[in-house]
Amino acid sequence: MEIKNWYELTFEIETNLEEIIIWKLNELGISSYAFEILLNNKNNKKVIIWLPHLNWPESLRIKLVRNIKEVLDKNNYQTNCFEWNLIEQEDWISSWKKYWGPEIVGDNLLILPCWLELPEEYKNKKVIKIDPGAAFGTGSHPTTSLCLEELEKISLSSKKILDIGSGSGILSIAARSFGASKIYSIDNDYLAINSTESNFRLNFGNLDNLKTYLGSFDGLVSKYTLKNFDFILCNILAEVIKGIIPDIRNCLKIDGEVILSGILNSQKDEIIKLLKASNLRINDVSSKKDWVCITAQKIP
């Protein structure tokens, strides 16, 4: 179904609340948003959220504002200034494009919006082209960049990869760019699956090394034979990760590794405890801002 119109919600927050708002939006399954620095008040930022018109009736929009206000109230910030606008597809495209530019991640990766030319100074970078569509993961958020930086460290040549919560497909594309031979991508949102396939084709011209599955990870594991993976990439909410760690272990080959992101610092210890309880050895823990990425390995 083609999205024709979008609701645009704007409000202001203190700059230090950006990460907690991102976490809340991710928890609510909202992935089209941006933050804008205010020139007249550099201690605050404007939050812009875009929502597909047909999926967000008034009752859900009221509930969304209530959820955001609760988060802000808990962090000692009060506002009642929430502004809604209904915008057409063309206006939405021009709105979010202005927040995009080339994004360097790690040592060698460049995330490039598909409508931009590759700048001359980045010719030596490994380029991942992205058409974000409804913006399911771009590389700019710490959870995604942490995963990409971990992928740079390891040898993926001829490896079999599972990407749980593929979103825009950015991690699947990076894995293939680093030499993975077969990528299996899972998401429970059909728009994300479409985005994964579209962006994979944009980068490689075909889908020969990609297989996609629409549905929840635990449901797909029981339906299909998803086993013997060298690496599993999982950039989703920690609350979801907690419930699927045993299934993740079962999908890995012996000595296979999982890269987990989407974890707040405050959630790290609990996730590590659950990984160890499932006989997954912690190999690496990295952090950026309030977020943590954990790499763990299946041991006999």
UniProtKB/Swiss-Prot annotation:
GO BP term, example: methylation
Keywords annotated in UniProt: Cytoplasm, Methyltransferase, S-adenosyl-L-methionine, Transferase
UniProt enzyme class: transferase
Sequence positions that bind S-adenosyl-L-methionine: 144, 165, 187, 235
Coarse class of the protein's main subcellular location: cytoplasm
Subcellular localization(s) per the UniProt record: Cytoplasm
Reactions catalysed: L-lysyl-[protein] + 3 S-adenosyl-L-methionine = N(6),N(6),N(6)-trimethyl-L-lysyl-[protein] + 3 S-adenosyl-L-homocysteine + 3 H(+)
InterPro entries for this protein: Ribosomal_L11_MeTrfase_PrmA, Ribosomal_PrmA_MeTrfase, SAM-dependent_MTases_sf
GO CC annotations, alphabetized: cytoplasm
Role of this protein: Methylates ribosomal protein L11.
Family indicated by similarity: Belongs to the methyltransferase superfamily. PrmA family.
The protein, known as: Ribosomal protein L11 methyltransferase
